[in-house]
Swiss-Prot record:
Taxonomic lineage: Bacteria, Pseudomonadati, Pseudomonadota, Gammaproteobacteria, Alteromonadales
Assigned keywords, A-Z: Methylation, Ribonucleoprotein, Ribosomal protein, RNA-binding, rRNA-binding
Native organism: Shewanella woodyi (strain ATCC 51908 / MS32)
GO biological process: translation
GO molecular function: rRNA binding; structural constituent of ribosome
Protein name as annotated: Large ribosomal subunit protein uL3
Keyword Ribosomal protein: yes
Amino acid sequence: MAIGLIGRKVGMTRIFTEDGASIPVTVIEIAANRVTQVRTLETDGYRALQVTTGTKKANRITKPEAGHFAKAGVEAGRGLWEVRLADDEGEGIEVGAELNVDIFADVAKVDVTGQSKGKGFQGGIKRWNFHAQDMTHGNSLAHRSNGSIGQNQTPGRVFKGKKMSGHMGAERVTTQNLDVVRVDAERNLLLVKGAVPGATNGNLIIKPAVKA
């Protein structure tokens, strides 16, 4: 486990290597992560850092939030996140400290977590990649139907977890082992190879890869 940071998905572009190869990259803005609270084994039963980033309009901040940020002595951010710490991590980090993108300077691969784009209510073909049925040859009603969803009198029910139509997307997704292409500490940018979950401007959690 290693310290992660909160970022914002800016969008995708591409960069070129010296030999002319094109690399598709996602640009992630990682502004300073301000520590608002330090969780400890003694008081909370686990070790973690609570951080905020970005800004929030003053009229959108509740009184409890305002008090929490004021106690930490940091500017109010757009949200609060917790990053778990291993036993040997986070020593010396105190409330009010700032964590920046340069902690990824020596990291080769990262895991990126975000909320996937919501797709609304979708059928089995789009949601689960089911095969469509015949368009002709006697089929006139069930072209995109799920087909059979179970057996007969035994068991006489549909099993829990059966893949069917329903709400798709808008859930927590992690993409693992993305190559770090560039760290731009001056502009607080991290460029990773490939796509990451979520829409433009969505919040992301970036951590060093656990499987690297």
